[in-house]
Design a protein with these regions (language model features):
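A glycine-rich phosphate-binding loop feature that marks nucleotide/adenosyl-phosphate handling sites
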Residues: 1-3, 77-87, 147-154, 215-224, ...
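Feature captures the FAD/FMN-dependent oxidoreductase FAD-binding
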Residues: 1-37, 82-93, 164, 220
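Short acidic, glycine/serine/threonine-rich loops at helix termini
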Residues: 7-12, 40-42, 76, 82-90, ...
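Glycine-rich loop(s) and the adjacent beta-strand/alpha-helix scaffold that form part
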Residues: 30-82, 204-205, 209, 262-270
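An anion/pyrophosphate-binding glycine-rich loop and adjacent beta-alpha core
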Residues: 62-198, 295-331
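A glycine-rich dinucleotide-binding beta-alpha-beta segment and adjacent secondary-structure elements
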Residues: 184-250, 278-291
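Glycine-rich phosphate/pyrophosphate-binding beta-alpha loops
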Residues: 246-254, 310-312
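Internal hydrophobic alpha-helix adjacent to the cofactor/substrate pocket in enzyme cavities
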Residues: 256-279
Length: 331
């Protein structure tokens, strides 16, 4: 685990680990996600970590910030992970995957992966009553958490407070993989005390015999000001330092993946003496995302939407090859 960014003559020179092992590098890519000084919240309980059972990264934020790079705090949340063997699937509605899907390339090989279904159900007034009883112990509402979370992924307690007139909220039970019984309960992100989460879920018929692997929790973490980056995602202050993902103030898998590929490409090009690779707003959603980050900055976790792209009529799935094949050939 890295604890320090090494800088020589104003440029990145490598990293140092917790075991004081020095790894020299011309470029370093930071994709630390929620691990930088990560702090998890479950009710009044606060646990240091980047994820459940995984240690947070300490000292690295401070190591970078001392060179003049600004940083702040954001938060996100995640739902319980459920043991599928305890679920009454007959009480839920199955949701099969899509069969009429389309690719972004005509050149890829056809690979058929086994498809697993998801399942849907709804909360009810009994669930809401239990959840409301736990609001005084919610870190989101008792002042324990001050950081800003993603606007478009509200916790279940935020849904209750924001939409008190709603008698139910839809939940999606999603398999974590083909070789596990673990399920992700999308729509039930929560930082309420564990006993409140379990008691509330057991009011749903499908979960009356609920068993869980991991509780839902909120997590606070450090991020860096993305306006201090170039469009290549290289730092304007520390040449050779590239950043991607939640450390730039974004939220979402695709957002992180899009930044990761751009940071990786440009780090490799910088090491090999190549020209910088910049994606523009009129040729890709990644270009829109990065341009928004480096020119406007963020005051809440950033998520990509088609409405953010003024060229969205041109940025279609069916013309991705025409837009980007030549760019990929160039690198």
């Amino acid at each position: 685990q890295v604890k320090e960014l090494l800088v020589e003559h104003g440029e990145v020179a490598g990293v140092k680990t917790y075991f004081d092992v020095v790894i020299r590098a011309r470029c370093v890519i930071l994709t630390a996600g929620t691990f930088l000084n990560g702090l998890m919240h479950i009710g009044h309980t606060q646990l240091p970590g980047g994820r459940v059972a995984e240690p947070a990264s300490y000292h690295l934020t401070e190591s970078i910030a001392r060179h003049g790079i600004n940083y702040g705090r954001m938060k996100t949340g995640t739902p319980v992970r459920i043991d599928g063997r305890s679920v009454h699937f007959e009480e839920m509605e199955i949701q099969e995957g899509e069969h009429d899907y389309h690719k972004f390339s005509f050149m890829g090989r056809d690979r058929q992966l086994k498809q697993l279904p998801c399942w849907t159900c709804f909360t009810n007034p009994e669930v809401h009553e239990v959840l409301r009883s736990g609001l005084p112990d919610s870190p989101l509402y008792n002042g324990q958490i001050q950081s800003i979370g993603p606007r478009y992924c509200p916790s279940i307690e935020t849904k209750l407070v924001t939409f008190p007139e709603r008698g139910q909220h839809q939940l999606f039970l999603e398999p974590e993989g083909e070789s596990t019984q673990e399920y992700y309960l999308n729509g039930f992100s929560s930082s309420l005390p564990l006993h409140i989460q379990i008691e509330a879920l057991k009011k749903i018929p499908a979960f009356r015999d609920l068993a869980i692997y991991r509780p839902g929790y909120a997590i606070e973490y450090d991020y860096f000001d993305p306006t201090q980056l170039y469009h290549t995602l290289e730092s304007k202050i520390l040449p050779g330092l590239f950043m991607a993902g939640q450390v730039n103030g974004t939220t979402g898998y695709e957002e992180a993946g899009g930044q990761g590929i751009v940071a990786g490409i440009n780090a490799a090009l910088k090491c090999s003496g190549g020209e910088p690779f910049v994606m523009h707003r009129d040729e890709s959603y990644i270009g829109v995302l990065i341009d928004d980050l480096v020119t406007k900055g963020v005051d809440e976790p950033y998520r990509m939407f088609t409405s953010r792209a003024e060229y969205r009529i041109l940025l279609r799935q069916d013309d991705a090859d025409a837009r980007l094949t030549e760019r990929s050939y160039q690198i």
